[in-house]
């Protein structure tokens, strides 16, 4: 685990974005941890979040021309990541996002920001069922652009309804790489460093044993 990944886990814990306990997911599964990126909700949070996304992007080595944030949660992520890339990595890249409702006045259309073209890096909070990615792919393809990759904050590394995860389905269906700031594996490595969190470690490992990929 790299220093920025450990720092991200501590940031998420401090903001109660990442919590341990017993939580019922939308799928009905009982999970020993929960991640709610919506709680990154202040200016400072967004500034830090952008730095972690930018760090993961640079670390990945993936090449891309533009950041795309799917409405709604992806919009502030794309914006703050673009700022962090410019400020901390000297990479001044364009970004854009979509509207859920097409505008019928002014410049019209359903895209805001730079023209959607070239190799697109899609940024979002998490991938649950992959629905937002599929909707975004339609927009990207309709504009003649290509998907360079997807970056999310956390990869839960667990099976969906089939034997593979929603992330693996996206990688298979769109022939692209999905990267994340942290994975479940990183979370377990972090818990292993904290003797006071042994109870949570056992629960998370048991969950991975049952649902992991």
Swiss-Prot record:
Enzyme Commission number: 2.4.2.10
Gene3D superfamilies per UniProt: 3.40.50.2020
Keywords recorded for this protein, A-Z: Glycosyltransferase, Magnesium, Pyrimidine biosynthesis, Transferase
Cofactor(s) listed in the protein's UniProt record: Mg(2+)
CDD domains, per the entry: PRTases_typeI
Swiss-Prot/TrEMBL catalytic activity: orotidine 5'-phosphate + diphosphate = orotate + 5-phospho-alpha-D-ribose 1-diphosphate
Binding site for orotate: 34-35, 128, 156
Binding residues for 5-phospho-alpha-D-ribose 1-diphosphate: 26, 72-73, 99-100, 103, 105, 124-132
HAMAP family xref list: PyrE (MF_01208)
Name used for this protein in its record: Orotate phosphoribosyltransferase
């Amino acid at each position: 685990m790299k220093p920025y990944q450990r720092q991200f886990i501590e940031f998420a814990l401090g903001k109660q974005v990442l919590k341990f306990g017993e939580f019922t997911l939308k799928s009905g599964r009982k999970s020993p941890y929960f991640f709610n990126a919506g709680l990154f909700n202040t200016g400072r949070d967004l500034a830090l979040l952008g730095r972690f996304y930018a760090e993961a992007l640079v670390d990945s080595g993936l090449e891309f021309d533009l950041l795309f944030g799917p409405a709604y949660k992806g919009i502030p992520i794309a914006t703050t990541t673009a700022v962090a890339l410019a400020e901390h990595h000297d990479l001044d890249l364009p970004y854009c996002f979509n509207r859920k409702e097409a505008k019928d006045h002014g410049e019209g259309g359903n895209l805001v920001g730079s023209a959607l073209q070239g190799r697109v890096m899609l940024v979002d909070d998490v991938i649950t069922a992959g629905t937002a990615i599929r909707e975004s792919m339609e927009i990207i393809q309709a504009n003649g652009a290509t998907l360079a990759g997807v970056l999310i904050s956390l990869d839960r590394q667990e099976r969906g309804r089939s034997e593979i995860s929603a992330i693996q389905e996206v990688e298979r269906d769109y022939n692209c790489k999905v990267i994340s700031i942290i994975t479940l594996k990183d979370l377990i490595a972090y818990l292993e460093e904290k003797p006071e969190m042994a109870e949570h470690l056992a629960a998370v490992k048991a969950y991975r044993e049952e649902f992991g990929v």
